[in-house]
């Protein structure tokens, strides 16, 4: 990281009541002397004139000075809070840039300074952007929890446990007790199992946090003419898909992005699944399976007039058996207006079964509540945190190494290989908070931030 002093507008561009210019770095004091004529008392609000190089007043407002390292960035920080007209703010930034050694900040560079100066870790820095971009109350609360260190705390605890176990294994290898076989005495195995269990819990929370941040991808799938497109239209609240009585009308993937009480939901309507010799329809079915395999949830659409079954294994075993092992499935028995079924939800062998009429809209509101619940809308979010895809990937890598380490211990009693898998898990977990992170990744993360953050 450079030692340049940087400046940027901290408030959103455009017209507003208040506009804030932020300066961070060693030259912040020089800016204060040039623009204000004095250095404000540290951490006190100072109402004063903001002047150009000839002494003319550009604006009037509040100046705040924070002496490093006791600032957000860890550097000397000066904030000039004036009126929110864009012309005035541009004039003020131009004046600041006249001071030698000042340059415009890159996107996210203030947060990057804070990260480099150990004022916050990478998950907390990312949480700043997530809090700004939050599209729901749940997302905002979870982002704030991450900003306050809840996610970091969980990861640090895992890193410490993995590190301690690794050091114990390595020490036992280097200084063996001839009377005790340390690999088979149960102590290491018990510690490893506890770490794996805790990691599994953190993965589940991170998965929920990722859904709250990025939205849940829901794929509507089933046989032709089951009412999939009608359900897409009912959930979207508009005629997004063409609906006819002709089986196979939908041949390509249709997407709708909606919000349920602020919770982002990505709905995918797919071609009806069946054996066909039609080349175009075959392509649509192949695309349907691609969407299913990357879904967070599948709505298995069933024409209720064709079967009384509710267990998906009885309805279409080949379809269920082809689904990814951990993919959640909700069974939708459609056309309840024709079958006369009660519009209710039941649990059948671990599956939620909803009875609706996509055509008339009956039961769709209950289904929406179900989808909101899956996204965490009704959950108690105390202690919950926001998570990104890269966090999930790092947790998955760590889990994979721990499972490999478990195999080395249980099957081969290979202490050296167990220690190596623990080391790799430690690195994967440390990438989440930025303890071990490449410069390329840091650049990618911070470049997605706002200029003044």
Curated annotation (Swiss-Prot):
Residues binding GTP: 225-230, 244-250, 269-272, 334-337
Record keyword tRNA processing present: yes
Matching InterPro entries: G_TrmE, GTP-bd, GTP-bd_TrmE_N, GTPase_MnmE, MnmE_dom2, MnmE_helical, P-loop_NTPase, Small_GTP-bd
Binding site for Mg(2+): 229, 250
The UniProt record lists the keyword Aminoacyl-tRNA synthetase: no
GO BP term, example: tRNA methylation
Cofactor(s) named in the record: K(+)
Residues annotated to bind (6S)-5-formyl-5,6,7,8-tetrahydrofolate: 22, 79, 119, 453
A single MF term (Gene Ontology): GTPase activity
Classification via CDD domains: trmE, TrmE_N
Gene3D superfamilies: P-loop containing nucleotide triphosphate hydrolases, Probable tRNA modification gtpase trme, domain 1, tRNA modification GTPase MnmE domain 2
Subcellular location: Cytoplasm
EC main group: hydrolase
GO cellular component: cytosol
Sequence ranges assigned to domain TrmE-type G in this UniProt record: 215-376
Keyword annotations from UniProtKB, A to Z: Cytoplasm, GTP-binding, Hydrolase, Magnesium, Metal-binding, Nucleotide-binding, Potassium, tRNA processing
Cofactor: how and how many bound: Binds 1 potassium ion per subunit.
Oligomer status and interactors: Homodimer. Heterotetramer of two MnmE and two MnmG subunits.
Family: Belongs to the TRAFAC class TrmE-Era-EngA-EngB-Septin-like GTPase superfamily. TrmE GTPase family.
Name the record gives this protein: tRNA modification GTPase MnmE
Originating species: Shewanella sp. (strain W3-18-1)
Gene: mnmE
